[in-house]
Amino acid sequence: MQHFRDKIVVVKYGGNAMVDDDLKAAFAADMVFLRTVGAKPVVVHGGGPQISEMLNRVGLQGEFKGGFRVTTPEVMDIVRMVLFGQVGRDLVGLINSHGPYAVGTSGEDAGLFTAQKRMVNIDGVPTDIGLVGDIINVDASSLMDIIEAGRIPVVSTIAPGEDGQIYNINADTAAGALAAAIGAERLLVLTNVEGLYTDWPDKSSLVSKIKATELEAILPGLDSGMIPKMESCLNAVRGGVSAAHVIDGRIAHSVLLELLTMGGIGTMVLPDVFDRENYPEGTVFRKDDKDGEL
């Protein structure tokens, strides 16, 4: 636990953890716990289920291509409203039920993110998916002010482009870019599965640890929904983050279980070369490791 004192931990909040009331409450409590013991949590959130629900309510068709939401201007209006006005506010409220910790912000605020339009490669063909962006710059000075004030930033993933357009940023992508930019110690990505399956749906293909080069080699063949998550982990680790984790958000207190228990509960992505002395005792040794293996 002492290992994480004064270190930034970026958590991408999503999946069942953001729709089940008990899991939402447990997640908020975990963020406050991390802050109380001296870590510096930063939450980056998506809002897929809530966006889909609102699109249905207003009669707009939602579509996904290559794991990304196709974002027309009409869909973008809903995305912006739901992410910052609903999901972000709800999480800020849950965290602040424990005390005045959380501050809501977005990629639009104080130039945190700058984006450019993203094309998605589907079956080898670059495909336009609308107002979906990639982050090309992170200016975290205002975010660091929030962190250093002892607060927990809750970041909505919408961002302006240099063309003046507002883009929908995949929250997994944003979390990885932010973690690397602010020198985070760890990135954790909450999902609705136990971790990384190298050959989904074969349950025996679940791995508890993988190095960056190994992940890069299998990335194109992964299930489409996992590609943005694992790409985010890869980019974070390549950007200097000590480790990135994909964990099962359906388990209450999954963040603490992954960070603070022997062997963790999910999949840990590590740099190709690492010194286990720089990691808390036992946490690099994972569930499916052989005796003596790093």
From Swiss-Prot:
One of its GO terms (molecular function) is acetylglutamate kinase activity. The record marks K12, K229 as: Transition state stabilizer. Disulfide bonds: none annotated. It catalyses: N-acetyl-L-glutamate + ATP = N-acetyl-L-glutamyl 5-phosphate + ADP. The keyword Transcription regulation does not apply. GO terms for biological process: arginine biosynthetic process via ornithine; L-arginine biosynthetic process. GO terms for cellular component: cytoplasm. Pathway: Amino-acid biosynthesis; L-arginine biosynthesis; N(2)-acetyl-L-ornithine from L-glutamate: step 2/4. It holds the Pfam family AA_kinase. Its EC number is 2.7.2.8. Substrate binds at G47, G48, R69, N168. It is found in: Cytoplasm. Its main location: cytoplasm. The keyword Kinase applies. Keywords: Amino-acid biosynthesis, Arginine biosynthesis, ATP-binding, Cytoplasm, Kinase, Nucleotide-binding, Transferase. HAMAP family: ArgB. Catalyzes the ATP-dependent phosphorylation of N-acetyl-L-glutamate. Belongs to the acetylglutamate kinase family. ArgB subfamily. NCBIfam families: argB. This is Acetylglutamate kinase. It comes from Corynebacterium glutamicum (strain ATCC 13032 / DSM 20300 / JCM 1318 / BCRC 11384 / CCUG 27702 / LMG 3730 / NBRC 12168 / NCIMB 10025 / NRRL B-2784 / 534). The lineage of its organism: Bacteria, Bacillati, Actinomycetota, Actinomycetes, Mycobacteriales.
